[in-house]
Amino acid sequence: MASEIPYDESPSGEESGEIKCKNIVTDPVRGLKICADTGEIIGEDIIGTESDVKAYTPEERQQKTHYGGPLKYSHHYMGVEASLEHPRDHGPKGIKQRKILPRRPPRLSARPLTSVDKNLQTALSLINEVASRMGMPEIVVEDASKIYREAMEKGLTRGRSIESIVAASLYAASRIHGLPHSLTDIIKAMKGNVDAETRRDVARSYRLLVRDLNIKIPVRKPENFVYTIISALGLPEHVAIEAIKIIDLSRKKGLTAGKDPGGLAGAAVYLAALKHGIRKTQKEIAHVVGVTEVTIRNRYKEIAQALGIEEELEEKGGEEKG
């Protein structure tokens, strides 16, 4: 099995029908791709429905074909179904009737589940449960499940807790697809609380998976955090577009290098909301992106000063007093 998980690395220059946009961002809450310049929805992230069968002749395809959709890494038996035939299944006109039943691997059909099988069942169930709580799209669930399976195949789960590898797999899959979930967010959704030792353990597991499975993690962009903040705080679309423009201007001014993308996005949304006369507290925004109020405040001041919009913001009501 290939260890590298593919991801789309071309955020600009995409086309959807006749729509062309050079500044595309993802709304992870709705699973949409949006043009940051116009606010138009130009596509969505959907798992492909194409066949996963590799065959070169009609006879070979007939032998290999399974019934149902594409393989599902998030299902214990990959969501594969088999066609079982019987002479009685032939109808009066000789039309073959098929019973579609889940295909259980032969090695498992005659004996109870092993500890490895139980481990996988528990892990996949936990991945689905945590992803559901966090509203992650199906493609992230599938990639997290694939990562966990590959980790098992390479023996990376031995000596480590299921929860640790599951959290690390979900975090890696989120990073691959540009979702702004932090390790802390995922651990909290899984366990309800976060302690320093658990976070260190999950961080170690994440680094192990990335290194040993050769997972390519794209650099996080602050733009990808914007729609998460907008959705969480119920802000209008024009605030998101304004925030993305502020981020773009900040990048041109050299303000984004080495800065936490969540903090930058939070400050940009705070600024954009103020410009449109909408008040949201730095505390509210900091909570959504998982940074401190101080981080939001510092980025806000840097951006406002560099863009020369301090006076404009003062006229709109100014920064909240810390």
UniProtKB/Swiss-Prot annotation:
Sequence repeats lie at residues 125-213, 224-305. InterPro entries: Cyclin-like_dom, Cyclin-like_sf, TFIIB, TFIIB_arc, TFIIB_CS, TFIIB_cyclin. GO terms for molecular function: DNA-binding transcription factor activity; TBP-class protein binding. GO terms for cellular component: transcription preinitiation complex. One of its GO terms (biological process) is transcription preinitiation complex assembly. The keyword Transcription regulation applies. It comes from the Archaea. The keyword Lyase does not apply. Keywords: Repeat, Transcription, Transcription regulation. Stabilizes TBP binding to an archaeal box-A promoter. Also responsible for recruiting RNA polymerase II to the pre-initiation complex (DNA-TBP-TFIIB). Belongs to the TFIIB family. This is Transcription initiation factor IIB. It comes from Aeropyrum pernix (strain ATCC 700893 / DSM 11879 / JCM 9820 / NBRC 100138 / K1).
